[in-house]
Swiss-Prot record:
Species this chain originates from: Drosophila melanogaster
Biological process according to GO: cellular respiration
Superkingdom to which the source organism belongs: Eukaryota
Function: Required for the function of coenzyme Q in the respiratory chain. May serve as a chaperone or may be involved in the transport of Q6 from its site of synthesis to the catalytic sites of the respiratory complexes.
Subunit description: Interacts with coenzyme Q.
Membrane association type: Peripheral membrane protein
One Gene Ontology MF term: ubiquinone binding
Name of protein: Coenzyme Q-binding protein COQ10, mitochondrial
Organism lineage string: Eukaryota, Metazoa, Ecdysozoa, Arthropoda, Hexapoda
Length: 242
């Protein structure tokens, strides 16, 4: 969680710029004595940040300095509603090990961060539909995803009907790993989404990488729980984001 001094720094350097930006991409700082309505908006954003940090920390204490944020956050980031993230990694589990966990959508609520409920229905030869509730009290979002399966190499989830975002795409693909180590594979993880609200986008942008890493790690930890220790240490091959 954020320490008091860090939260004050966020109020001045991050929270106010998030609330109002110029169309040209330059941030307009507010008067040191903001109006009551702006105080309310900032307070809501602080609560959202606290909730995000609480979920991202996984129960461990984390502290963030204002200099860290200044190094990685630009005013253009605050204007983005569309984000994407890709990561290719060599892991010490077989394609089937990874596929069996990622395709187990009905149990996402047991091990995937932010997923509170996951129900599968409308099964077909190429996949199924899944109703999910994600979020953290008191904020929750319900949506339906179309999940496409190509065992044991692909799990693709798409949603275009969410109230929180315009679309959400999540794709996992698996390819053979090292020839001399059968229990290894190369996983390619991709996530792309666009929020309807610029305010939600701004909050997510601050912790975008952290959230993506935490979600990916949740699947790896679940594979470890089911299949045991990995055959080799994982190695990140490529990683990129918008």
């Amino acid at each position: 969680m954020l320490k008091g001094s860090t939260l004050k720094a966020l109020d001045v350097r991050i929270l106010w710029p998030l609330i109002e930006t110029r169309s040209a991409g330059k941030c307009k700082l507010h008067n040191p004595r903001p109006t009551p309505n702006r105080n309310i908006a900032a307070a809501k954003l602080i609560v959202t940040l606290r909730l995000l940090l609480s979920c991202c920390s996984g129960g461990h204490q984390r502290s963030f300095s204002s200099s860290t944020h200044r190094s990685y956050i630009t005013f253009n980031d605050f204007r983005k509603k569309h984000r994407w993230y890709t990561k290719k990694e060599l892991v010490g589990y077989s394609m089937q090990d990874m596929y069996s966990v990622v395709s187990d959508v009905s149990n996402y609520h047991k091990f995937v961060p932010y997923v509170k409920r996951s129900d599968v229905h409308s099964r077909g030869s190429e996949g199924f539909k899944a109703d999910l509730i994600v979020g953290f009290p008191p904020l929750n979002e319900a949506y339906t995803s179309q999940v496409t399966l190509v065992p044991p190499s692909l799990v693709k989830s798409e949603c275009h009907d969410g109230r929180l975002f315009n679309y959400l795409l999540n794709e996992w693909s698996f390819k053979p790993g090292l020839k001399d180590i059968p229990n290894s594979c190369v996983l390619d993880f991709k996530v792309s989404f666009e929020f309807k609200s610029l305010l939600h986008s701004n909050v997510a942008n601050i912790f975008f990488d952290l959230i993506c890493d935490q979600m990916e790690n949740a699947f790896i930890q679940e594979v470890r729980r089911r299949s045991g220790p990995p055959s080799i240490r994982s190695h990140v091959l490529t990683s990129d984001r918008s």
